[in-house]
Design a protein with these regions (language model features):
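Glycine-aromatic micro-motifs
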Residues: 1-90
């Protein structure tokens, strides 16, 4: 389902977004997956080099708090445009 991550900012890195710690709210989606898929997702996301996986607090649409894995951008965002809405549109 959909969720909000408070205390983060989303940047437009061109072909993809990058979430970093910040003063905003990032809107995204939460999926339940088998634990064994995390290594595969790490590879897809370029972790731990391009992105790093961290457990963060999110709030679901029904206001339920949840700890979820998120991929935070692991490089500088200087020069990248902030996505003010906090939501990446594909």
């Amino acid at each position: 389902g959909h969720a909000l991550a408070k205390g983060f900012a989303l940047y437009d890195l061109g072909a993809y977004p990058g979430m970093v710690p910040g003063d905003g709210v990032v809107r995204g989606e939460v999926y339940e997956i088998p634990e064994g898929l995390l290594r595969e997702l790490d590879w897809v996301e370029g972790a731990p080099f391009l992105f790093r996986r961290e457990l963060i607090e999110v709030v679901l649409e029904d206001h339920t708090p949840l700890r979820a894995h998120a991929y935070l951008y692991n490089r500088e965002v200087e020069g990248a445009a902030l996505v003010p809405s906090g939501e990446w549109k594909v």
